[in-house]
Amino acid sequence: MLKETIRSGDWKGEKHVPVIEYEREGDLVKVEVSVGKEIPHPNTPEHHIAWIELYFHPEGGQFPILVGRVEFTNHSDPLTEPRAVFFFKTSKKGKLYALSYCNIHGLWENEVQLE
């Protein structure tokens, strides 16, 4: 049921889709997740990104692992933006999944392959 409510799209044309960018140095993985990279997302009490979650699903693993969650509680400061950086260690390949929640337009997802 939840699966049918999660939206996705091309982040270059849709401001709600989380953008996932990562760097790997040995086992240390640095992942930046942002919403509104190409088209800025509003950050007002009436329309904002409330949170971002990052998951890692290792190849051969049964379930994805929650790497972290960031909540954005200030929705009136023009200097804040929905962006978070996560660090974790793994030697495995797999998929990175990001979820973001817009208080008006709901859940949005994106995924990238971690090599």
Curated annotation (Swiss-Prot):
Gene3D superfamilies: SOR catalytic domain (2.60.40.730). Belongs to the desulfoferrodoxin family. It holds the Pfam family Desulfoferrodox. It is an enzyme of class 1 (oxidoreductase). Its cofactor is Fe cation. Uses electrons from reduced NADP, by way of rubredoxin and an oxidoreductase, to catalyze the reduction of superoxide to hydrogen peroxide. Homotetramer. InterPro entries: Desulfoferrodoxin_Fe-bd_dom (IPR002742), Desulfoferrodoxin_Fe-bd_dom_sf (IPR036073), Desulfoferrodoxin_SOR (IPR051233). It comes from Pyrococcus horikoshii (strain ATCC 700860 / DSM 12428 / JCM 9974 / NBRC 100139 / OT-3). GO terms for molecular function: iron ion binding; superoxide reductase activity. Keywords: Electron transport, Iron, Metal-binding, Oxidoreductase, Transport. It comes from the Archaea. Its EC number is 1.15.1.2. Fe cation binds at residues 14, 16, 41, 47, 102, 105. It catalyses: reduced [rubredoxin] + superoxide + 2 H(+) = oxidized [rubredoxin] + H2O2. This is Superoxide reductase.
